Amino acid sequence: MTVTETATISEKLSQSQILRDYERAFSEAPTGDEMRAMKVELESAMRAGAIGFSTSRTRNHQTPDGQPVASRVATWDEVRELVGVLGDLDAGIVEIANEEAGRDPQAQREYQVRLRDLAVESGRPVTFGMFSSRRAPDIWPPYFDLLDETAAMGGRMFIQAHSRALNVLMSFETRLPFDKFPVWKELRKKSLADQEAGLRDPVLRARLVESANGNHEEKQGVGAEMRRPDYDWLLVMDSVAGPHRTVADLARERGKDPVEVMIEVALEHKLKVFFRQPLFNEDQDHVLAMMRHPRSVVTFSDSGAHVSQIMDSSLQTHVLSHWVREKGALSLEEAVRMLTLEPATAWGFDDRGLIRVGMAADLIVFDPAKVAPLMPEVRHDLPAGARRLVQKAAGISATVVNGQVLMRNGEHTGVYPGQLLRGPLAAAR
């Protein structure tokens, strides 16, 4: 193991384990006996070292056949009962992927009250990610007000705030919104070199443009799935920092169809260019306000999910390069605290986050004048040659984990000093 990791126990996992019948976990409420068994499993996981309980209520989390994941069909009473186990143990954190309450203020408030009461009644910290959206720019502030409201009632709640837009990256090296259309599907089966040759054929290119603009029956994309592009918000990521031009702007400038422009831009870069589609956090003033809130923590990641679609590992280097060095919106000291002590404190790890005798020796050695994310790259090093996105950084000379130099100037030193960091109940044994 290279880095220090932790684990939570998920509601989906405990449901599937206890109900045994996979289909029942996705369609039926547990019986009284099954609910008691789920609570036993949750306590067992906490005593084995889990740092908390996680669950999902968001429509973005579906099975491959488009059905809700098991936790989405659970009642809120089931969630309360399971979180109550953590309250009884006086340990652990509750992480939740939020319900979509829509734009109805009453529905939003009803959900926020449930979240608040969950934190207050259980006595356990509740956390979730929050973003702004160009489609609903007023959705996020009430959730930040909720943090203060919960604290005033004796509960603990914090929001995980991203440091930039949350983007889906698409490219000829990975996936495009048109891949499922027959003429595109035939092209995309070929090697990158053969795709490039095909795209230079004006006859084939015309067919591709026509196909992409056709009236296709398409289901609404969820999460990081490909969807029909919004060209006014589809940007050419030809550099890390930008500014990035939109495909719509380039199409108007060149007097061509947006799909034609995407093909042209890709050919100009030998097909090695990303188009980024922001899903959330388009307004960077909103991003900064969320980061600065005293009850937010600057962190967010889908971890092992969407590895060929989303690249969030540059969240921290973006804080240091963009918000500190380029914008001057944060001091270096503020930013370092946001990225180290505040997450450690929020998740209850009081042995790390500071450089102090007796604390965990996890350090990043960087040059404030040079630290920055590099361009994402595509690698095919997962099992069966599956692809993933990788993003490295400039200006970091060393990464120290548990007192050992793990990375030096961007290269792995060959040591594996990471460990599974267990929660307080396991540590107390």
Regions found by a protein language model. Give the residues of each.
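Divalent metal-coordination and catalytic microenvironments
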Residues: 49, 160, 255, 302, ...
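Ligand-binding pocket scaffold of soluble enzyme catalytic domains
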Residues: 353, 398, 429
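Acidic, glycine-enriched loop/beta-strand segments at the rims
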Residues: 273-281, 287, 332-336, 344-378
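Short loop/turn motifs at secondary-structure junctions and domain boundaries
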Residues: 240-241, 344, 388-391
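Active-site neighborhoods of metal-dependent hydrolases
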Residues: 1-4, 8-18, 25-69, 74, ...
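C-terminal cap of metal-dependent C-N hydrolases
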Residues: 289-296, 301, 313-315, 364-419
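Hydrophobic alpha-helix feature that most strongly marks membrane-spanning transmembrane helices
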Residues: 87, 120, 152, 252, ...
